[in-house]
């Protein structure tokens, strides 16, 4: 049976003037206690032992318990607090601490002007319901925790921290204005569901040091840094969550590998999905909208895998750089102001069933021989400049790739790079279908170019072009053109339609089994120039001087001298 105690600052019959006196009486009796507290301000520190309920008799906000310095409530046992306001300050102090057993804060407000607001110590359990925590952080250390329908405002540190094996659940709550993180999980487990997190100074939600974090149906906005971050071999999941106006939507690095599903990263100020420093991650059915710099970024050993994702608006779609890797399957990239797919500087990417539409450039690859990209079963449509352009020493393979209304060019290679194309189609380009420039190497098998306003295939510089079993139809200027010292072969190919020429070549390309009714022409050889002028200098013991093979004018000569000083005096302009 529960014993009931009344507390009133005015005293009265069977009423205690302070809460501490009622707690002492309850401890002496050793029974479960209900302590009802009349409205007022109680300046005292409460140490609660046993099974005790502290209740504001006239509802939340009517009872204030505070101290100018130090802890306000220390709980040992099974303690619940209903409707009280607990306020205190003190660096390094726990304003409310659960030392043993369990503590429940229901419709309670905790103000921690300095230090920790609520601390659940190891092997304890703390529950907050419909409560408010102001200024201080709520810490779960090796304990169990639950926060439902709470508000955590303006924490000077992390709003909520789960540490050292803690298991914490946060539901339906709002976290706002934290100077560091909204929720930090360090070597612990936390689940945050249906929450709003906004205005944090650093990552809104973060897992580190092998922590495990589950984020479900949350709204994260206006963070100064990352929306969600997994680092230091942490793991977990993000489901049906929206991140808006973060520097980076979600970041994973240093061995972390979350699974992110059905989430949206909108209007991020730098990147939407950022995987770096050996980070991992699987992203399914996600959308990145309006990323200011790069929508999906893999760098420095990062290795994400994206499936069924959508990138729309913003600058660059997917960028894999500086040794990053990535696999991208059934991804749509559209309506960008920059490049859709970028692979630079030893990056390695595999794109499968990717669709790129309405972008200035499709795929760009540039870097040394360790820079590679593979594109299969993909479509580039309405690209302003070129569907695929590679440079440096990079290596790119295209299989069953289509470029429709591809802008200026379809697929081109330059520098010392190598481009291999198989079973692919290009339609509606303005300059050329496939081509090699500089010292680039182009190998194409079963490629079709239709309706080019310029050329079907071309080579310039010292490029090498090897094209077999391909068809070039209705290419306005020529089906194939080879200039300068470009070399290679055109074997078992067909040039047909209404173009002006089948092939215009320089004599360095092997034309084998070419099927065409259009003319094949060779560039005219440039006429030989005049022989170089030679000036002979004869030197022997008898004579040492120049020999002239014709008239010479306006020269200055000196020989047999160890030192020569040349002076020139300007005349009056009357002599040549």
Across the structure, where does each feature detected by a protein language model lie?
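Extended, small-residue-rich solenoid/repeat segments and analogous flexible loops
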Residues: 64, 106, 129-130, 239, ...
